[in-house]
């Protein structure tokens, strides 16, 4: 086996792919799994790579291209798949308290924490299947830069116990998710299905809301992490985030948005919204396949704006009625886009600041 050692001071994504091509990974479509030494060598390369912000910038550039194509679905969605090997690369996004719950990997994977931290719970797979209940085995803290791997089928549950978003980098086998064939019977209670259904797979217009919400939250998670990225590419990545819908991530040190005027349009022309008063709050509701859903609530100051939004399919922030400052209008518009109900359209324009 020929192992390529990467210079940890100058790791780029294409360098990593070149190194992986030199390892003894089976070709895509082959039934064989790689030898453990190949996975460990790949883990070593990942360990060097995630410490290099230019490497992360290269990967985030590919991730933003994926987000721009709007091809998201639940779980890890690869931003790149290696030709010939089928090895998949993806980012994991972890809001405060976020966890997918206990789930099973059935082939090798390598995971690195890029920003902030995670805690990883592992379960005794053999005992869990034998007793038909999840049996906790270990609990590992994983701070930024920590890299772990799975070689044999494993049950684990990462969780972000912090108050900030975390970002993880995943390199996975093309065979991860296949049934290893070593257990039979009903699914293990408490374990996520290997092939989770996409709950947005519906003809209802609310599907577009879910898709857009997922997209914009990931864009903003990236945008809010970019100030800590020591790379010349950080500025262009920030511009891309802003253009894709992360306009409130573009802030000077004062904490106020640097951009003012823009227009919003409902994410789907047939999406129905309504407005009600509830305990002194102005509440915006959407119509979903299961009925009305509360999306956004503002105090009495935003009552006129919410009533207006419930009726209008497109508008500029200055169109919103009420005694609102520019900053307040921006925050309402920001919240509307983060819900996935509205998308920004057209170019920015100058408007009067407070």
Language-model regions: role of each:
Residues 100-103, 120-121, 155-162:
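Short beta-strand His + acidic residue motifs that chelate non-heme Fe in jelly-roll/DSBH
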Residues 304-324:
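Short acidic, hydrophobic short linear motifs in intrinsically disordered regions
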Residues 84, 110, 125-156:
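Short acidic-glycine-tyrosine-enriched beta hairpin
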Residues 65-96, 144, 284:
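A short glycine-rich, His/Asp/Glu-containing loop-to-beta-strand
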Residues 110-114, 163-180:
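A short hydrophobic beta-strand segment most commonly corresponding to one strand
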Residues 95-96, 106-125:
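Glycine- and acidic-residue-biased ligand/ion/polar-headgroup-sensing regions
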Residues 230-309, 334, 349-354:
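Acidic, low-complexity/disordered tracts enriched in E/D and polar residues
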Residues 90-104, 141-142, 151-153:
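Conserved short histidine dyad/triad with adjacent acidic residue
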């Amino acid at each position: 086996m020929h192992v390529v050692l990467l210079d940890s001071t100058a790791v780029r994504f294409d360098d990593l792919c070149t190194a992986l091509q030199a390892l003894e990974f089976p070709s895509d479509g082959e039934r064989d799994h790689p030898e453990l030494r190949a996975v460990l060598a790949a883990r070593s390369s990942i360990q060097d790579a995630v410490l290099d912000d230019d490497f992360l910038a290269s990967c985030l550039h590919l991730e933003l291209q994926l987000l721009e194509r709007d091809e998201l679905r639940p779980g890890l969605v690869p931003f790149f798949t290696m030709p010939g090997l089928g090895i998949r690369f993806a980012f994991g996004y972890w809001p405060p308290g976020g966890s997918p719950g206990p789930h099973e990997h059935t082939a090798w994977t390598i995971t690195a924490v890029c920003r902030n931290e995670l805690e990883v719970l592992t379960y005794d797979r053999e005992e869990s299947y034998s007793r038909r209940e999840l049996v906790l085995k270990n609990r590992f803290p994983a701070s930024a830069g920590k890299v772990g791997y799975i070689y044999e089928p494993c049950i684990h549950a990462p969780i972000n116990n912090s108050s900030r978003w975390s970002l993880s980098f995943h390199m996975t086998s093309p065979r991860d998710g296949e049934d290893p064939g070593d257990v039979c019977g009903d699914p293990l209670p408490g374990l996520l299905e290997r092939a989770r259904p996409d709950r947005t797979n519906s003809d209802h217009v609310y599907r577009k809301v879910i898709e857009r919400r997922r997209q914009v939250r990931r864009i903003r998670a990236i945008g809010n992490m970019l100030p800590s990225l020591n790379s010349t590419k950080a500025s262009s990545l920030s511009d891309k985030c802003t253009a894709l819908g992360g306009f409130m991530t573009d802030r000077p040190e004062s904490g106020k948005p640097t951009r003012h005027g823009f227009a919003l349009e409902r994410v789907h022309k047939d999406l129905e919204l309504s407005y009600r008063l509830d305990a002194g709050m102005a509440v915006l509701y959407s119509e979903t396949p299961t009925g009305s859903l509360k999306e956004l609530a503002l105090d009495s100051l935003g009552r006129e704006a919410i009533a207006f939004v419930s009726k209008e399919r497109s508008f500029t922030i200055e169109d919103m009625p009420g005694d609102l400052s520019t900053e307040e209008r921006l925050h309402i518009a920001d919240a509307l886009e983060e819900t996935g109900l509205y998308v920004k359209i057209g170019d920015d324009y100058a408007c009067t600041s407070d």
